[in-house]
Amino acid sequence: MPLGRSSPGDILSRAATGLLVATSIAVVTGIACAFSTKGITQPGAMLSLGSGALAGILAYLFSRDPNRPALSAWDILMLAIFGIASFRAFAWLLYAVGNSWRILSPNNLGDLSLHIQFIRYFAEGSPFWPESPILSGVPLTYPIGADFFNSLLCLAGMPLECG
């Protein structure tokens, strides 16, 4: 476990490592659970998210590189601007206004509906390896990682629009 004070750059680097490890382990564990139960279930989703969280915490605690140079003020400024721009682009992909749903960019209209379809399809417990929900009788060849992770969050009780 790292001892002493950590720089902001070290904390950001370790947090990013922890989040990537947590997400990856949750997805891999979820897919293993889905294969063993012929579809993802709520207990499988909880187990997957829990194992991902544990792996992410361990990665955060033990991923310190003592030889990594400290970030400069310009590096931190660039990371902050990138973080703000990313938050702006992804935080409001889908949001409610009154009784209607809206999207931030009309360019996301077709793509977002595809992702929502995949998330709901996985969360409903589709048999694994699933067929394409769009093309009948064709195995799914789409990279499912992010959509599968969001389906785990849906099964854990998080609303789709928040994931």
Briefly describe each language-model feature range:
Residues 1-72, 76:
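Membrane-embedded, hydrophobic transmembrane alpha-helices
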Residues 71-89:
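Internal/C-terminal transmembrane anchor helices
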